[in-house]
Amino acid sequence: GTAAVQLAKYYGAQIHAVANTKNIELIKSLGAEKVFDYTQEDFTKQNEQYDVILDAVGKSSYFKCKHLLKSGGVYFSTELGYAMQNMWLSLVTVFMNKKTKFPIPTDNQQDILLFKKIIEEGKYRAIIERVYPLHEIIEATKYVETGQKTGNIVIQVNEG
């Protein structure tokens, strides 16, 4: 989520994001023009429409967001969704006006060089919420699974 906001900003997108109360200012500082506080409102109940919706944490669905997509709009999710629906919808919606895409991560050199450039230009900063020593990796995983993390969790492999 925090990386996506910064990358979208780099490309000049107008960004509306969804976060909890404690993260609103952080998300705005990364480039979001408007932030919906999900503890106060359901962003799917508003009337604005978007070219792209990215669900970076798997809290929504194509079906909840479809009416928010403009004609030709695309819903991305980083999660498989209920019964792996996002993977299947990415195939089914190929011929529809509003699509779902399920991104499959790759490690191509072009993407790595782009992130290097953005970092060197000072237009990207890693948001690191917590650092766990390797022997606490189970606790780190449990924390990530709560869905309450902001940014990244780092596992420190070597002490010192």
Model-flagged regions — what are they?
Residues 1-160:
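Terminal helix/beta-alpha structural elements that buttress the NAD(P)+-binding lobe
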